[in-house]
Amino acid sequence: MSQLTLTLLMIVAAYLAGSVSSAVLVCRMRGLPDPRSQGSGNPGATNVLRIGGASSAAMVLFFDMLKGALPTYLAYLMGIDAISLGLIAIAACLGHIYPIFFGFKGGKGVATAFGAMAPIGDDLAICLMASWVVLVLISRYSSLAAIITALLAPLYTWWLDDRFTIPVAMLSTLIIIRHKENIQRLLKGEESKVSRKKRPKAP
């Protein structure tokens, strides 16, 4: 099989893997409202945190990251070049953003993009996660944390393993474009802050 054929097959496989909406499936299994019609309307871990609590959000986060990590890492093991790895990672994110199995209404792709970047190295994964967590704790805006972390990701990659700077920059660009509406709401002071589902008070 030629390198081009293998790359195209992995792009299709990555898109299909990304199209499995973890948020919708976890909410269905746990009897929670559809995240596409509740909270922010975004089927991602942050919105599931709002409507279903931390454990449900953690499940969504894990599986969304896995959707990006598995196809990208498998392609890396197959010897696919760095630029093609970037295209495969983008395909996984596009599947998450526009899932064919869920009416093309998906999330922002942040966790899936992080999952695709994480196999580059533990040091990069730690830098990205630490940046996002610190920014969320400071600002309470998940979207702002994601945008700034996406901007930092190519710089971290260039510093730690410059072979993958271009693929990571491609992913970061996609994430920032996907947050266009969030950027507008942030500028207007209308963006929702991170909050957990409130437990009902005991009678």
UniProtKB/Swiss-Prot annotation:
InterPro entries: G3P_acylTferase_PlsY (IPR003811). It is an enzyme of class 2 (transferase). Pathway: Lipid metabolism; phospholipid metabolism. GO terms for biological process: phospholipid biosynthetic process. The chain crosses the membrane at residues 6-26, 82-102, 118-138, 141-161. Its main location: membrane. Belongs to the PlsY family. This is Glycerol-3-phosphate acyltransferase. The gene is plsY.
